[in-house]
Amino acid sequence: MKHLNSLILGSLLLGTGARAQTAPALTTFPVGATTVTVSALTTGLQVPWELVWGTDNFIWMTERGGRISRVDPNSGQVTPLITLPDVATSSEGGLLGMVLHPDFTTSPYVYVVYNYNDTGYKEKLVRLTYANGTLGSPVVLLGDIPAVSTHSGSRLLILPDRTLLMTTGDAQDRPSAQNRSSPNGKILRLNLDGTIPTDNPVAGNRSYSFGHRNPQGLVRASNGRIYSSEHGENAEDEVNIIEANANYGWPTVEGLCNLAAEQAFCTANNVRQPIFTWAPTVGVAGLTYYDHPAIPGWRNSLLAATLRGNKLTQIPLDAAGTTAGTGAFTLTSFGRLRAICVSPAGRVYVGTSNRDGRATPGTSDDQILVLENRAFVPTATTASRSSQLRLWPNPASRTVTLQLPNPATTAATVHIHDALGRAVRTAQFAAGQSSLSLSLHGLQPGLYSVKTAAGTQRLVIE
């Protein structure tokens, strides 16, 4: 573990500031008054499917053929960690989604989803361990998921309560999306050891939400809401707010409930409608949330990579995160876009997918593109604000005290959200007040987030 801690410390010193060398600009485009510069971080990749910004301030990447690598965001150097021998690539199938354990220094686990052959084509969730610059010690947490060469879903997200969400596609078996006993066409929720959480919507069932066709984007925003992007069939692609036990309508409903048959089904089954759609479909893939001052025009927005659409879509959100504004489309000169992540410095990294058999690749493909405001200079006020809010004691049992860095100039609201993003308590600092004591009476033991304008902190209630 000493090696891993040293690696992360060294990366922290390099990864969040200026890039070691400025790559040539490939193009620029405006976002409001900001000029966003596009450059190539690294080239010659083979279908980068997932990009994850790690706690070591490196980009962790899967490529569909089975390789997992770390990418230096300063130099673009790609360091392979493992090539999984049992990955079975076929059409859209292969090595797909990945997520890192949030406590990576003490739990150096990497979770991946991929297709494999075992008396048929299947999908599985595997945990790997990072040690001495390599990945190994695979543990299958969930296997035997029916699959075909398309519609595997496969995005992963770890929630603050340390449960894992995993999207699955319908594997071209349309009725499976409404069948709660099938793992297909769902967003599954598991513990990090692969067991089923006791508080899942249906006891003993991994299904968290259902009625999905092929969700391939998944992100939790700072508002606590979970968003997923989903491939439609022909009419509409979607962005949905994911809620426990919710039905998203497939295969009867595609996109909005705006046809007669859809409306009847939606009413009878309390179907959740998307907050944003593309019509016609654009092949929406990776999804991330952006709220950094480096590009002010993108703050509080979802950014979605599209394959058939060959563009990046900005989806602005309202303050509550429940309503989406009109989409803005950029980055239209680089072909199919699949993977996306954001660094703490406000740079956006986008992976192209032009070697996936559905495009004519250029000499540089596939590549990771960097989108950045090169004129942005971080200051103390634009750095992460999470450290400005203090909580004690933590863990807490009966009460918790909140301390602001300075007295509130106006009344300031405090929100406590549970691990699923639900608001469970609200309080308020009065103008001139800097310290506030909150009763935790009635809140169950677990992990919560405390949010104010001064930042967000994690709270453990015992």
Language-model region placement:
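Bacterial Sec-dependent N-terminal signal peptides
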Residues: M1-T22
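Short coil/turn segments at the loop-to-beta-strand junctions that recur within blades
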Residues: L45-P48, P85-T89, D144-S149, A203-G204, ...
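Acidic, Gly/Ser/Thr-rich repeat motifs that build Ca2+-stabilized beta-propeller blades
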Residues: Q21-R174, R225-G232, P280-A319, R347-G357, ...
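C-terminal outer-membrane/trafficking sorting elements
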Residues: T382-W392, A396-E462
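Hydrophobic beta-strand positions
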Residues: R70-V71, R189, I416
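Surface-exposed loop/edge segments in extracytoplasmic proteins
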Residues: Q77-P80, A324, R422-A427
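Beta-propeller domain segments
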Residues: A23-T28, G93-L95, D103-T105, A171-G327, ...
